Design a protein with these regions (language model features):
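Bacterial Sec-dependent N-terminal signal peptides
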Residues: 1-31
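Acidic, contiguous N-terminal accessory segments
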Residues: 22-159
Length: 160
């Protein structure tokens, strides 16, 4: 009877062990207390952080080669800081995405707005340079992990 019970439980137990071994054991949240201070910081209602993992995608505007290079630059930063490889794409994605966008009506071409929710990060710059400066803020906020065994997270908030 014990062998029969063990043979039924073994596949399920193996699946649980395999699933938990492939996921980061913990999450380390970075902090957005950066210098220079943003003009405005709005704390999010939901304090759940945005978690960066292997399924995270950096999305850039299609046909914008400068933004493609900027997205690759951010992916390299994330890999160096956290050990996690993220994808880069020009295809829209609404969840687990870092979305880079340009809005020339923002007023200042080197300004940017950074909105972080548990589902996505939206970085909008007044120009490609503004997006680049916003990436510097993300870079400063990322925890240094390097091994990929601990997930990196960004606190939920909005900055301008």
């Amino acid at each position: 009877m014990n062998k029969k019970l063990l043979s039924r439980l073994a596949p399920g137990l193996f699946a649980v062990v395999l699933f938990t071994a492939c996921r980061p054991a913990a999450t380390v949240k970075g902090n957005l207390d950066v210098i220079p201070q943003p003009q405005e910081i709005v704390l999010a209602r939901d304090t759940t952080p945005f978690i960066i993992d292997r399924s995270t995608t950096i999305v850039y505007p299609a046909t914008n080669e400068k933004m493609h290079r900027t997205a690759d630059f951010l992916a390299t930063f994330i890999k160096e800081m956290t050990g996690t490889e993220v994808r880069v794409s020009d295809k829209e994605k609404s969840s687990n995405a870092i979305i880079l966008a340009v809005d020339s009506t923002m007023g200042h071409p080197e300004g940017y707005k950074l909105q972080i929710t548990p589902e996505k990060v939206l970085l909008t710059g007044g120009s490609e340079a503004g997006v680049f400066y916003g990436i510097q803020t993300i870079h400063k906020a990322l925890p240094i992990l390097k091994d990929g065994k601990v997930a990196a997270a960004l606190p939920a908030r909005s900055e301008e």
